[in-house]
Design a protein with these regions (language model features):
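Conserved "cap/hinge" positions at secondary-structure junctions
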Residues: 87-88, 133
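Short beta-strand-centered aromatic/proline hotspots
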Residues: 90-100
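Short, well-ordered loop/turn sites that connect or cap secondary structure elements
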Residues: 77-79, 84
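Short, basic/aromatic beta-hairpin or loop at an interaction surface
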Residues: 50-67, 107
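Glycine- and charge-enriched low-complexity intrinsically disordered segments
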Residues: 2-27, 39-41, 102, 106-143
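Long, compositionally biased intrinsically disordered regions
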Residues: 31-33, 38-41, 47-49, 142
Length: 143
């Protein structure tokens, strides 16, 4: 998000369709150059947490926790710095996107205090997920 250019936007909502329960310290994801991605209703994307914060194109992200896959209930724009909630809990803020699985899905990288998995957060299929407009990454992690 660029506060000098961007106004308000809708909340992007979805539901978990599959929970993942593992973590890795050598994943090798690469941060895409784009800080925002347009998404469509019905798309499924993977949610991945990391404690790494280096928001530059090509940054390598190794320490990750896999939360699961979300099906989006509406289209919209997901920006770096957006708050990610699952149920009533703030999981973290969007760091960016890894496109290694395109055209199948994006890995949406979420900055969190630690790389948590779906098991760690006791997630379940159908848990509500939301991406709410943040403050352009000024806050690395929502507490």
């Amino acid at each position: 998000m660029n506060p000098a250019e961007d106004g308000a936007k809708r909340v992007v909502r979805g539901a978990l369709v599959k929970v993942l329960v593992h973590r890795r310290t050598d994943r090798g994801m690469r941060l895409e150059e784009h800080a925002a991605r347009c998404v469509r209703r019905g798309e499924v994307h993977e949610l991945v947490t990391t404690d790494q914060w280096e928001p530059r194109p090509g940054a390598r992200v190794d320490r990750v926790g896999f939360l699961g896959f979300v099906e989006l209930e509406c289209g919209g724009v997901i920006d770096r710095g957006d708050l990610v909630r699952i149920g009533d809990a703030v999981v973290g803020t969007v760091l960016g996107f890894d496109a290694c699985h395109l055209p199948n899905h994006y890995n949406i990288l979420i900055h969190a205090e630690r790389p948590a998995s779906g098991l760690d957060l006791e997630l379940r299929p159908e848990d509500a997920v939301s991406f709410t407009q943040g403050r352009a990454g000024r806050e690395r992690t929502a507490h």
